[in-house]
Amino acid sequence: METSEHIPVLLAEAVAALEIAPNGRYLDATFGRGGHSSEILAQLGESGQLYALDRDQQAAAVAAQITDPRFHFARCAFSEMETAFAALGAESLDGILFDLGVSSPQLDDPSRGFSFAKEGPLDMRMDNEQNLTAQKWLKNVDEDTLTTVIRDYGGEPHTVAKRIAKAILAAKNDLKSTLDLASVVAQARPKKLYKPHLHPATQTFQAIRIAVNDEIGEIQRALRAATMMLKSGGILVVISFHGLEDATVKRFVRSMEGEPLPAEIPATNTTNIHQVLRLVPPVIKPSSAEIAQNPRSRSAKLRKAVKL
């Protein structure tokens, strides 16, 4: 299977957490370049089945090269998994894997507009056919909304987020590329907040990307769908890469366990779902060896839950 240049994070740990049964039915909800799917297929028996999905056009092109009859792919957002796989009989699964966030091929391709370090269009779409780009979003967003997005999705202090938002909107008609945006953010962000080896536009780019792709809403809807599709005893494995993703996963699983939410995790309507998941500790993080090989893995966290 062609996996491109993408290095799957926590590969062995994620597949081990799924506890692959040779004749089981599994879903790789974030196919990417097929790294996790390849390992799952290697562990499945002849009658095992692997379903996979991704909304990225290039990921779909990689999936189209796979001729293994046990493999089934649909191009869609992972929140649409129930509809996509109902016709294939994938409504009762032994395990589902999510590898959240943006992939290395997406980050490294300047034409996708995710990188603050390379010249590219203000795009940031995970689905190339989605109408809304980062440039369109920035042209229409108001200052309060942009401030909230940079604060909540980027983790910037409110006063800093507001300062960055003002600067972006003041320059929005002149923003033609990722480097234009990165420059505006870098100039607006207070120098005292600069961190070694971290570009000053990192958090703002993350925030805008999350907003353009509705990533948090997608995760919430996808976790609901995944819980419905798992059979009793089925395993949910989620790899997250930043605090907001991880908090969203924790909030969902805690609501499904029926436990009180900690103060730092605000309640949402996920608390109305029946308690059907059990969290399986511990949280798994990359080894020092993996981080050395793939520095982008350093913030990854793997959480596992079992459907009761």
Swiss-Prot record:
Which Gene3D superfamilies does the annotation name? Putative methyltransferase TM0872, insert domain, Vaccinia Virus protein VP39
Q: Which GO terms describe its molecular function?
A: rRNA (cytosine-N4-)-methyltransferase activity
Q: Does the keyword Cytoplasm apply?
A: yes
Q: List ligand-binding residues for S-adenosyl-L-methionine.
A: G34, G35, H36, D54, F85, D99, Q106
- State any GO CC term: cytoplasm
Q: What class of enzyme is it?
A: transferase
EC number(s) recorded for this UniProt protein: 2.1.1.199
Catalyzed reaction equations: cytidine(1402) in 16S rRNA + S-adenosyl-L-methionine = N(4)-methylcytidine(1402) in 16S rRNA + S-adenosyl-L-homocysteine + H(+)
Lineage, top-rank taxon, reads: Bacteria
Give one GO biological process term: rRNA base methylation
* Signal peptide interval: none
Location in the cell reads: Cytoplasm
Q: What is its main location?
A: cytoplasm
InterPro entries found in the cross-reference section: RsmH, SAM-dep_MeTrfase_MraW_recog, SAM-dependent_MTases_sf
Q: Which UniProt keywords apply?
A: Cytoplasm, Methyltransferase, rRNA processing, S-adenosyl-L-methionine, Transferase
Keyword set includes Transferase: yes
Alphabetical list of NCBIfam families matching this protein: 16S rRNA (cytosine(1402)-N(4))-methyltransferase RsmH
Protein family (similarity comment):
Belongs to the methyltransferase superfamily. RsmH family.
Q: What does this protein's UniProt record list under function? A: Specifically methylates the N4 position of cytidine in position 1402 (C1402) of 16S rRNA.
Q: What is this protein called?
A: Ribosomal RNA small subunit methyltransferase H
Organism for this UniProt entry? Dichelobacter nodosus (strain VCS1703A)
Q: Which gene encodes it?
A: rsmH
